[in-house]
Amino acid sequence: MSTDLVRFIADLSNRWRSRFSPSRPEHLRLGARGEKLACRFLRRSGYKVLYRNFRGRSGGEIDIVCRDKDTLVFVEVKTRTREDFGRPFDAIDRSKQKRIARGGLAWLRLLDDPDILFRFDVVEVIIVEDAQPRFELLRNAFALPEPYIY
């Protein structure tokens, strides 16, 4: 068995164990729940979900990769239990945008199609006790922070 395959299987196993571990911190469990709810919301909104939790080799990360008609969409999900400290979108600063952009560019490199249309969306998920989750979809929430080459 190749070393890359062994590494891939070990990484997958670690992710699986850590995702469902009962000792996982509350904020991580909340984030995972928000991503699951956001996937359902996006499907109901007509998006086709392609992948969850993509990590690029360059350190970039994408919560959800999906398609909206002919456009590839990289979605960042922000989940909160209240809005006392501003909207969830406010937590996406320039450095977070760069990390998301690196993940998106890593995905585009895998496709090897420089002419594909893409954008970055944000889904805000507000989960309040004893109420239905609330969703806000911000299409084209931000642009690439700098010119890109892939």
Predicted regions and their residues:
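Conserved catalytic cores of phosphodiester-cleaving nucleases, focusing on short active-site segments
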Residues: 42, 62-85, 100
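Acidic-basic catalytic patches of nuclease active cores, encompassing PD-(D/E)XK
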Residues: 2-52
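Protein kinase-like catalytic core scaffold
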Residues: 60, 71-73, 121, 136
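Short, solvent-exposed loop/turn elements at beta->coil junctions and helix N-caps
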Residues: 52-56, 123-126
